């Protein structure tokens, strides 16, 4: 009797467990979106209903400390490796490696030498090594062959490709026959305009509104593809932006002989490579030359920047105060908005918002580090993290206390495109969910009745058997 009882119990337990959850996807899905140069307080400069919709229905971090230097390529590589710039090797947008005797330049799009990228392993490679698929639409570095690998799907960088076309590719990859579980999407604004006009310009308002409109378009497309409630959407950036002016310019030619050094990287962190035998002369001429310029020998760079332990960091690094601009002379290009300054400055900090089945709702956290995103992604995707500088414990409170699981999609009547009122709170479950739970409950009840009948019959049979045992000795007497 015991084996039959156990079999029935196991069958009941299996059905009770599986029925309500049979509609759930097998794994978490994550989409990371970066709006380049989106400073943390842009959310409040003009109405941003779609950003606030995510904040209301997901999580928001007020202050994200990114890595020094606060530029595009170092910080985008930090987001996907969890490493400081000195550890992942992309120390600037423009670099010189004395070991390789090669240069790296974002300005000239000379960025495709794999050796510059292979001091670290981006998470899309780890994800693919675990048997999953990844996709990247214009994410910086994703079109570079790193450790003999590209993302499963990727778009070669082309600034002319529209945001809508990039979104279409992301949706296609998430809904393919062999879908991705990890996607990356990059957009150049508001960084481009921020450089041109400066973050304090009234012209920035329309650009921020347009980025919000594009986020609304992404939300609409995710809902249309029935992905909104099943994909964990993370919206972030690489850095902020500060206002500059031509009245705050530091000209290196006023202090240095240009024949004595090579300027590897420019404002606001000048990476200076002195010519052979000219180190002391260059350093002495520049140190103390301007009250708004701090000059470091490489070994004297502050530890808090985690920046000096890499061959690509030049022997002399000159850092301008916030809002000050470094030029060789006034004939060089000047930008009204700039970034790259000390990562402790609030104006250098980017945004961080997230929505999805793994995240809490209407929750705001005060602070995190950009290095923490990598460990969060590894946790969501159940990947073994490689060594990194972030901390999962620093961001675990962003997650729902319940075991993260995607929920079935339900169409909202509000598409969140161009609306100032993004609509009502999201539904937590849909009709398919309730149908699944109901079917599971009915099946459980049926098997419970069958089990009770089985137990009753077993008891009757046992009583009859015992009666025969009791009567048997009397017959023998």
Swiss-Prot record:
Q: Give me the glycosylation sites of this protein.
A: 101, 158, 292, 329, 362, 369, 382, 389
The UniProt record gives the binding positions of Zn(2+) 2 as 191, 195, 339
Specify the signal sequence span.
1-24
Tissues where the protein occurs: Expressed abundantly in the brain and kidney, and at lower levels in the liver.
Of the GO CC terms on this record, one is: plasma membrane
**What EC number(s) has UniProt assigned to this enzyme?**
3.1.-.-
Could you tell me what this protein does?
Answer: Can hydrolyze NAD but cannot hydrolyze nucleotide di- and triphosphates. Lacks lysopholipase D activity. May play a role in neuronal cell communication.
Tell me what this protein is called: Ectonucleotide pyrophosphatase/phosphodiesterase family member 5
Recorded source organism is: Mus musculus (Mouse)
């Amino acid at each position: 009797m015991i084996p039959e009882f156990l079999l029935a119990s196991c069958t009941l337990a299996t059905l009770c467990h599986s029925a309500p959850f049979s509609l759930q996807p097998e794994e978490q899905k994550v989409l990371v979106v970066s709006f380049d140069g989106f400073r943390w307080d842009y959310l409040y400069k003009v109405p941003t209903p779609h950003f606030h919709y995510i904040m209301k229905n997901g999580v928001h971090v007020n202050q994200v400390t990114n890595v020094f230097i606060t530029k595009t390529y170092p910080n985008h590589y930090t987001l996907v490796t969890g490493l400081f710039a000195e550890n992942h090797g992309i120390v600037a947008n423009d670099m010189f490696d004395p070991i390789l005797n090669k240069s790296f330049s974002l300005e000239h799009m000379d960025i495709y030498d794999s050796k510059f990228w292979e001091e670290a392993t981006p998470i899309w490679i780890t994800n693919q090594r675990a048997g999953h698929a990844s996709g990247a639409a214009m994410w910086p570095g994703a079109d570079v062959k790193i450790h003999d690998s590209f993302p499963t799907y990727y778009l070669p960088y082309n600034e002319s490709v529209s945001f809508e076309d990039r979104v279409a590719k992301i949706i296609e990859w998430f809904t393919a026959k062999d879908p991705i579980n990890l996607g990356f999407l990059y957009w150049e604004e508001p960084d481009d305009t921020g450089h041109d006009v400066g973050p304090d310009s009234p012209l920035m308002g329309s650009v921020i509104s347009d980025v919000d409109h594009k986020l609304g378009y992404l939300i609409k497309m995710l809902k249309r593809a029935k992905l909104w409630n099943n994909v964990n959407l993370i919206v972030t950036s690489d850095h902020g932006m500060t206002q500059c002016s031509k009245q705050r310019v530091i000209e290196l030619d006023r202090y240095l002989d240009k024949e004595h050094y090579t300027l590897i990287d420019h404002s606001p962190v000048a990476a200076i490579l002195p010519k052979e035998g000219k180190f002391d002369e260059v350093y002495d001429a520049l140190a103390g030359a301007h009250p708004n310029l701090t000059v470091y020998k490489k070994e004297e760079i502050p530890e808090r920047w985690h920046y000096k332990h890499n061959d690509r960091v030049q022997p002399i690094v000159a850092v301008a105060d916030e809002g000050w601009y470094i030029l060789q002379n006034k004939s060089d290009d000047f930008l009204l908005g700039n970034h790259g300054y000390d990562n402790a400055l609030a104006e250098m900090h980017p945004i961080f918002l997230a929505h999805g089945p793994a995240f809490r709702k209407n929750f705001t956290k005060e602070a995190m580090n950009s290095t923490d995103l990598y460990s969060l992604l590894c946790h969501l995707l159940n990947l073994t993290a490689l060594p990194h500088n972030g901390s999962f414990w620093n961001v675990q409170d962003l997650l729902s206390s319940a075991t993260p699981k995607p929920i079935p999609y339900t169409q909202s009547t509000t598409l969140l495109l161009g609306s100032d009122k993004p609509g009502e709170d999201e539904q937590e479950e849909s009709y398919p969910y309730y149908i699944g739970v109901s079917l599971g409950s009915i099946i459980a009840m049926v098997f419970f009745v069958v089990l009770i009948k089985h137990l009753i019959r077993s008891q009757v049979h046992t009583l009859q058997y015992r009666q025969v045992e009791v009567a048997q000795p009397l017959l023998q007497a």
